[in-house]
């Protein structure tokens, strides 16, 4: 087993990039550390940062395609290898870079025979193509491909109703997230009361921004969310005079069953957010669990001791170590069998 040595900062916590690479024009990767942190802080920051990276950063996408000569999305055009639906799906994958808001227009107008790629899109000056080689269509004959595009900037997902409007336009399910994936893990070091933590964060982006830019953007968004608390002032509020009030349903003791279900769901969501690589498991135990598709604390708690012993290369010593960690950090236990 190869152990990695990381230079740990002293004093105030500091960020550092320990690994960075470009796998392709549409896949950037970086790994960062934040240290030193007090016990419990790394997990708290890691969970918040991961959610901000995946859900709070904005991206630019093609959200609508318009072609007056096409009767419906699943039709074909003579002289074009792909169906209209396949062309729309290819346009959905185009990665764009822009800082402007609102709806922007773009277009493609090409005559075959030739391949049509992202570089053939006529864009406004404020929008850039990340990978000009992305395939759109193959015109096999002397035919024209003329389509209009709508570009928007947003965050998260935008699910569109699968239908074409009367003007011949087709909405696209857009994925605005420039961060493809983000993981975090925690490493503890030190002894006794002086135990501290290092937070590791891995970020993969689609090339429209670098992982470092994504980390900065996510951090800024989190800070913006907390700023109102820094300026909060206690003052008497008369709810009956508030014209902007929102009616809230009051819980009564008759809603005890509903409250219990809400608590269970919150607990389940929390367990899903805790990954086993955040625990103090040896690499051998961790790898065995990963191969058995056990990735989170919730996955682990859905197994009994008997189930774990069925995992290849797993022994009773591994199970005991897991039981100790569950009891020590979470107050949980595993049943001996699945009955």
From Swiss-Prot:
Top-level EC class as recorded in UniProt: transferase
Gene Ontology CC, one term: DNA-directed RNA polymerase complex
Transmembrane segments: none
Principal location: plastid
Subcellular location: Plastid, Chloroplast
InterPro entries noted in UniProt: DNA-dir_RNA_pol_insert, DNA-dir_RNA_pol_RpoA/D/Rpb3, DNA-dir_RpoA, RBP11-like, RNAP_asu_C, RNApol_insert_sf
Similarity field: Belongs to the RNA polymerase alpha chain family.
Recorded domain comment: The N-terminal domain is essential for RNAP assembly and basal transcription, whereas the C-terminal domain is involved in interaction with transcriptional regulators and with upstream promoter elements.
Protein name as catalogued: DNA-directed RNA polymerase subunit alpha
